[in-house]
């Protein structure tokens, strides 16, 4: 049903297909259309938001043989475009700095820069996870950025710009990528599903989008996994995704919150342990609890808020969440949220993983009496 992984199969081939990074796309396309190409770009932002994709699009656009003056989109038909799309262009060099971080790797790169492009106008170097370069390697790269050959373009991509040396940052045009919104991810997934002729229920799609945490690549990878897990069973339901990812069911969280809000420590602890016996880890349960308590806190402040978690709920579940927000004092919500946030770290080091949660339950129930 699906031959290539979805995030590769549907990787944008034009700037107009890129979602969520309009500010970056507009600046780059203006520069390409006006032939104002910089020798070095720095793409910073969360994983899976399009940094490498835009680096490849830039490489295609500047080297496209059919692109006319004033245009910015690659044709995707000429020899240079096709080779980049297929991943076998001699003039697009991609380097993973996580595994090629030493000074010898950068020296090898510097030696390669001296040679003119084999077919294209520019030789484009994409250095992914650039913050992982060693100090010596970063300094060696800096010298190249200071005096680059006219045929070379560098695209440095990083998820942790604070680890980059300031002198490298200052020599690049910097673009900050943002996390994608839930609705942007859903729109993209719907387009893919339409082309793949696969049906997924809306709540299931919303859950996938919220679990991706702003990363379109993570969303597409998760969708791929869900399709494989579901087989021929369609439409794919929300429950399938919850089972696959080990997500705590909403009704389980709501029942636990009922005991917590009513200050029934005995029932809350008993329910917690019975739930964990079914295979959930304390970490999974605690994380889900934090997510829902945060949502209740935000609803207490503004009942009209539409956060990612809310979008994945049914109308009945939304009303239940609002009911918790309405009947629970804000001080109690804050107290519970703070305790379970502290518990998150304690679980990792506890010889009895659920013990920190049990202690938090007792403390919350006693304090709110």
Give, region by region, the residue ranges found by the protein language model.
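P-loop/Walker A NTP-binding region and its immediately flanking N-terminal helices
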Residues: 1-174, 184, 192
């Amino acid at each position: 049903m699906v031959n290539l992984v979805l995030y590769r199969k549907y990787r944008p081939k034009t700037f107009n297909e890129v979602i969520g990074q309009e500010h970056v796309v507009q600046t780059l396309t203006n520069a390409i259309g006006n032939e104002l190409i910089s020798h070095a770009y720095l793409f910073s932002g969360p994983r899976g938001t399009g940094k490498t994709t835009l680096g490849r699009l830039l490489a295609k656009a500047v080297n496209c043989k059919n692109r006319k003056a004033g245009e910015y989109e690659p044709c995707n038909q000429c020899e240079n475009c096709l080779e980049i799309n297929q991943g076998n262009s001699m003039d697009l060099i991609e380097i993973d700095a996580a595994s090629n971080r030493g000074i010898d790797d950068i020296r090898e790169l510097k030696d390669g820069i001296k040679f003119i492009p084999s077919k294209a106008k520019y030789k484009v170097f994409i250095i992914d996870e650039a913050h992982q370069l060693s100090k010596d390697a970063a300094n060696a790269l800096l010298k190249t950025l200071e005096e680059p050959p006219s045929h070379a373009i560098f695209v440095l991509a990083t998820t942790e710009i604070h680890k980059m040396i300031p002198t490298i940052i200052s020599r690049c045009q910097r673009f900050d990528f943002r996390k994608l919104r839930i609705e942007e991810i859903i729109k993209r997934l719907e387009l893919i599903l339409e082309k793949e002729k696969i049906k997924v229920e809306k709540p299931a799609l919303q859950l996938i989008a919220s679990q991706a945490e702003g990363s379109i690549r993570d969303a597409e990878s998760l969708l791929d996994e869900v399709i494989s897990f579901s087989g021929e069973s369609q439409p794919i339901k929300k429950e399938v995704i919850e089972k696959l990812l080990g997500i705590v069911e909403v009704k389980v969280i709501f029942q636990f919150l009922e005991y917590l809000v009513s200050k029934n420590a005995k029932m809350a602890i008993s329910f917690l342990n019975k739930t964990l016996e079914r295979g959930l880890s304390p970490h999974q349960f605690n994380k889900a609890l934090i997510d829902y308590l945060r949502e209740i806190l935000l609803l207490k402040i503004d009942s009209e808020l539409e956060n990612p978690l809310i979008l994945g709920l049914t109308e009945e579940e939304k009303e239940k969440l609002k009911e918790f927000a309405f009947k629970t004092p804000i001080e109690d919500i804050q107290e519970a949220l703070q305790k379970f946030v502290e518990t998150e770290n304690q679980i990792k080091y506890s010889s009895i993983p659920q013990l920190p949660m049990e202690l938090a339950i007792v403390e919350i129930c006693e304090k709110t009496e």
